[in-house]
Amino acid sequence: MSTLPPLYATLNVALGGAIGAVLRYQMGRWMTGWLGAPAMSVFPWATLAINALGSLLMGVLAGVLFKLSPGVQDQWRLLIGTGILGGFTTFSAFSLEVWVMVERGQPAFAALYVVLSVSLAISALVFGLMLTRLFA
């Protein structure tokens, strides 16, 4: 629970969420331009990359927040963690993409995507934490 006033906490989450959603949209557009629409229609590369990057950044954030005072932690956790990274990463899109692959008759791709997404997300989070412990 936050120590910030409820309105202030809500505004931090809302602002961060808007920023994160725009960043996710722009990264998806950039990846489509970089890899091409055919590659993006075969495998959800953008969602995989976004969720892995978001996990890395969450690990960095967690490592940094650990060193801050509780009041400062709350503001940055709500703005960046819940807001920006919550708006940036997307578990609902991941779930839909897995199911679409299953419906297309591609259960092996679906399984690969699940394994890659979970292992990359956890590995990226741990790497982010290790970076902050190494450099902070």
UniProtKB/Swiss-Prot annotation:
GO molecular function, one term: metal ion binding
Keyword flag Phosphoprotein: no
Sequence intervals crossing the membrane: 3-23, 46-66, 78-98, 109-129
One of the protein's GO biological processes: cellular detoxification of fluoride
Name of one Pfam family that matches: CRCB
Main location: membrane
Catalytic reaction list: fluoride(in) = fluoride(out)
Regulation of catalytic or functional activity: Na(+) is not transported, but it plays an essential structural role and its presence is essential for fluoride channel function.
One GO cellular component term: plasma membrane
UniProt: Na(+) binding residues: 86, 89
UniProt membrane topology term: Multi-pass membrane protein
Annotated localization: Cell inner membrane
Keyword field: Cell inner membrane, Cell membrane, Ion channel, Ion transport, Membrane, Metal-binding, Sodium, Transmembrane, Transmembrane helix, Transport
NCBIfam families documented for this protein: crcB
Function: Fluoride-specific ion channel. Important for reducing fluoride concentration in the cell, thus reducing its toxicity.
HAMAP family hit by this protein: FluC
Family: Belongs to the fluoride channel Fluc/FEX (TC 1.A.43) family.
The protein's name: Fluoride-specific ion channel FluC
Organism expressing this protein natively: Erythrobacter litoralis (strain HTCC2594)
Lineage start: Bacteria, Pseudomonadati, Pseudomonadota, Alphaproteobacteria, Sphingomonadales
